[in-house]
Design a protein with these regions (language model features):
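N-terminal Rossmann NAD(P)H-binding glycine-rich loop of SDR-like oxidoreductase domains
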Residues: 3-19
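C-terminal amphipathic/interface module of NAD(P)-dependent oxidoreductases
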Residues: 265-296
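Mid/C-terminal beta-alpha module of Rossmann-like enzyme folds, strongest
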Residues: 200, 207-263, 291
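Adenosine-cofactor binding site in Rossmann-like domains, unifying the SAM/SAH pocket
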Residues: 21-43
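Catalytic helix-loop patch of NAD(P)-dependent Rossmann-fold dehydrogenases
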Residues: 70-77, 81-85, 105-150, 154-156
Length: 296
């Protein structure tokens, strides 16, 4: 299977590159091809002639995009317009396009998990830019584009080089330096291990379900506070809110999102339910594996 992976140096991109390394893989990032350059992208895709195009490129700086007009413009170019270019190049090469989207396309007002058919209603500029990417694909689906739009949430995993740190690593670093930590307790979603997501993508390529929108996250859900607490417990190095010998004491407090003002609004509840495919393993099990193999 000839696979063109775009955004290969990002957090998810690195996990996808590892998972697809046994395939005929061309893994690139912005230094090789900038997806916002329509002509260069089209030429590059014609040269590579992929059967599968996996787009893990995105502009994800949620707060920067909200407060800075230039960043917002960039977000729409990368997350929406360029996705249209990729979709067009995929049709021209008869390739299947796999694209990632986010729980932030929903407003969070629902009190049960969002299913694929729920109507998106983003409450941030980032969310609107990602919805723009979904719409660009759906427009070309009417012209024969083969596609999977995969919505996911709260990615964690190992990221080296230019890849960014995720919440799990940020919590462990903060706990090593401080003894008082506080995290938001009223934003609920599903943490997702990038290696599990990458494997789930590979499985979709084997089983080839119908083209469309899919929800792929680890099973279960939690707040940021509960995730932080689980991370600290799993690391085995900290005792939380009560002193224990041989472990560093951490005073861990839940806070409300209104007490941590940030430029962009986040959905209060954005659990994604998969009605089309079997759920992935529980996030606690995936987190344990990640911490054991990277932090112990
Ligand atoms: N992270 C999460 O928690 C999360 C949650 C839900 C959904 N998602 C979705 O999952 C996907 C992967 O996210 P991620 O967290 O892995 O992203 P990431 O770590 O920010 O990686 C994105 C990659 O895309 C590259 N890129 C950006 N603009 C590009 C361009 N114009 N041309 C080519 N490459 C470009 C970036 O390169 P530079 O470093 O040079 O910019 C970076 O290597 C995205 O679609 C995202 O919306 C992520």
């Amino acid at each position: 299977m000839r696979v063109l992976l775009i955004g290969a140096k990002g957090l998810l991109g690195q996990a996808l590159a590892a998972t697809f390394s046994t395939e005929d893989l061309v893994a690139v990032d912005r230094d090789v091809i900038d997806i916002t350059d329509k002509v260069a992208l089209q030429k590059f895709c014609h040269e590579v002639r992929p059967e599968i195009v996996v787009n893990a490129a995105a502009y994800n700086a949620v707060d920067e995009i909200e407060k800075n007009d230039e960043a917002a413009k960039q977000a729409f170019v990368i997350n929406a317009e360029a996705v249209g270019y990729l979709a067009k190049a995929s049709i021209e090469n008869k390739a299947l396009l796999i694209h990632f989207s986010t729980d932030y396309v929903f407003d969070g007002a629902k009190d049960s998990p969002y299913i694929e058919a729920d109507h998106p209603k983003p409450i941030s500029v980032y969310g609107r830019s990602k919805l723009g990417g979904e719409e660009a694909i759906l427009r070309l689906a009417e012209h024969g584009l083969k596609y999977y739009i995969i919505r996911t949430s709260r990615l964690f995993g190992k990221s080296s080089g230019a890849g960014k740190k995720t919440f799990v690593d940020i919590v462990l670093e903060a706990a090593a330096q401080k003894s008082e930590l506080q995290f938001i307790d009223d934003e609920i979603a599903s943490p997702t291990f990038v290696s599990d997501l990458a494997m789930a993508v590979k499985e979709m390529l084997m089983s080839r379900p119908a083209f469309g929108v899919y929800h792929r996250t680890n099973d279960g859900y939690c707040s940021w506070y509960e995730l932080a607490k689980t991370v600290l417990n799993e690391s085995g190095a900290y005792s939380i809110n009560h002193a224990t010998p041989d472990r560093k004491y951490i005073n861990l407090r839940p806070i409300a999102s209104k007490d941590l003002p940030r430029p962009a609004r986040r959905p209060a509840y954005s659990v994604l339910q998969s009605t089309k495919l079997a759920p992935l393993r529980h996030w606690r099990e995936a987190l344990r594996e990640y911490i054991i193999s990277n932090h112990l």
